[in-house]
Amino acid sequence: MIEALLVATGGFFGAITRFAISNWLKKRNKTQFPIATFLINITGAFLLGYIIGSGVTTGWQLLLGTGFMGAFTTFSTFKLESVQLLNRKNFSTFLLYLSATYIVGILFAFLGMKLGGI
């Protein structure tokens, strides 16, 4: 039961943090590129890598990794925004968003793990 509470607590704070950062960034973004989701997902990839790489206990992994990072990052919004770019026939931004998210995300997860200690 404690494990579920850790995940739920982390998820609550992760979702609230994503909501606040996303709204703040969207108000300042003047381009077609979905910068809010991109930065949130890249930051989340790095932080999750760091959390796992640092070898924290299972409880902290559940709270911060599964809970907070699971709710903070957003795969579904990334896919929705990708489809919206395609529907608007904004192919160059679509390709940039797709490739940058995967390439930079994997790189940042790797860097996080390395800095975390693995």
Swiss-Prot record:
Keywords: Cell membrane, Ion channel, Ion transport, Membrane, Metal-binding, Sodium, Transmembrane, Transmembrane helix, Transport. One of its GO terms (molecular function) is metal ion binding. GO terms for biological process: cellular detoxification of fluoride. Disulfide bonds: none annotated. It is found in: Cell membrane. It is a multi-pass membrane protein. It catalyses: fluoride(in) = fluoride(out). Pfam families: CRCB (PF02537). Na(+) binds at residues 70, 73. InterPro entries: FluC (IPR003691). Na(+) is not transported, but it plays an essential structural role and its presence is essential for fluoride channel function. GO terms for cellular component: plasma membrane. It comes from the Bacteria. The chain crosses the membrane at residues 1-21, 33-53, 55-75, 93-113. Fluoride-specific ion channel. Important for reducing fluoride concentration in the cell, thus reducing its toxicity. HAMAP family: FluC. Belongs to the fluoride channel Fluc/FEX (TC 1.A.43) family. This is Fluoride-specific ion channel FluC 2.
